[in-house]
Design a protein with these regions (language model features):
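Glycine-rich, basic loop-to-helix element that forms the pyrophosphate-binding segment
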Residues: 59-77
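Active-site-adjacent helix/loop segment of glycosyltransferases
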Residues: 205-284, 291
Length: 322
């Protein structure tokens, strides 16, 4: 088997249908699609299976998040290469072949991701620099880029050639199975978000390259699974913050680690507290304020858990490891 395409689903069947319809034309015999259905609902699962019999479906009774869902998919994958693809991405087999060709140009490239545009045609950020002490603040990050523009490639700029960068998004990520195994695969420490930066960090620590291919383009309807309602939006945005703490714990050291933890929380708590107060004053009628109030409630509970257990992992990630 040449390629295994792995998609982790959370109640995004409508998006996946568009993705599979785009792939189905000319789909090679030596490729496979594996869908891991988190918190699987039997009726929808069965209906989709009958509609797309050429796809391998795995019912996961728990909502295990993105990274661990990918791990479940990899266990069943037979491909020499692995393509991790969000359910809200639309790509053709031709675009996938083009990305495979770009990767083949440099044998040292372990992970590669293409240009991604929204349904409105606007380009999305696909790569960036590894989290550090400075870039916890958007202002300081922008100032550093202003005074030292050559330090790292700019993810907002238009690029024509292959870009070697720190990390690329896991929304559409191609990697050889051998490199995936060498790196150690997706970390179960992250329930959702930042796991792609972690994977790329461990790759670069081994001397492997990470690349962005602007010559290949796919469509990404960003947030197709993570913004379906206020509760899910609060939960996923909370997990972004938690995953930043996990990354700091795993990859920073000494004083830097402590300062990163302080900044991750300290830069967010004042705004969340203000939003929660406004949420109460407006009788919880404004969805945006309800989302931020939910983030605050979850974040404070998380910090209490950190103080109690000494672990920075999300409770959801700990559940995956139990």
């Amino acid at each position: 088997m040449k390629l295994s395409i792995i998609i982790v689903n959370y109640r995004a069947w409508a998006h996946i249908a568009k993705a599979l319809d785009a792939l189905q034309a000319g789909f090679p015999d030596d490729w496979e699609v594996i869908i891991v259905d988190n918190e699987s609902e039997p009726e929808a699962f069965a209906e989709f299976g009958s509609r797309y019999p050429w796809v391998r479906l795995i019912a996961n009774p728990a909502n295990s998040g993105f990274g661990f869902g990918c791990v479940i998919g990899v266990r069943e994958a037979a491909g020499e290469q692995l393509l991790f693809m969000n359910p809200d991405v639309v790509a053709t087999t031709g675009e996938i072949r083009a990305l495979m060709a770009e990767k083949a140009e440099d044998p040292d490239v372990a992970l590669i991701s293409p240009r991604q545009v929204g349904t409105d045609g606007k380009p999305q950020k696909v790569f960036d620099e590894f989290p550090d002490l400075v870039n916890q603040s958007k202002t300081l990050k922008a100032l550093r880029r202003l005074v030292w523009p050559s330090r790292k490639p700019d993810p907002r700029a238009e690029h024509r050639e292959l870009v070697y960068c720190d990390w690329v998004t896991g929304a559409f990520l191609l990697i050889d199975r051998a490199d995936y195994d060498r790196i150690g695969g997706w970390s179960a420490d992250y329930w959702m978000y930042v796991e792609d930066a972690d994977l790329c960090k461990r790759a670069t620590d081994l001397g492997l390259k990470v690349a962005y291919a602007p010559g290949v383009e796919v469509i990404h309807a960003h947030g197709g699974s993570s913004r379906i309602n206020v509760a899910v939006k609060s939960m996923t945005k909370l997990e972004v913050i938690i995953s930043k703490h996990v990354y700091a714990h795993n990859h920073a050291g000494g004083v830097t680690r402590g300062l990163m933890h302080v900044l991750i929380g300290g830069l967010r708590l004042p705004g969340l507290l203000l939003a929660a107060a406004l949420d109460l004053l407006t009788l919880r009628r404004i969805p945006t304020l309800r989302v931020r109030s939910g983030i605050l409630t979850g974040l404070l509970a998380y910090y209490r858990g950190v103080a109690r257990t000494g672990s920075w992992l999300s409770p959801r990630a700990r559940a995956n490891q139990s």
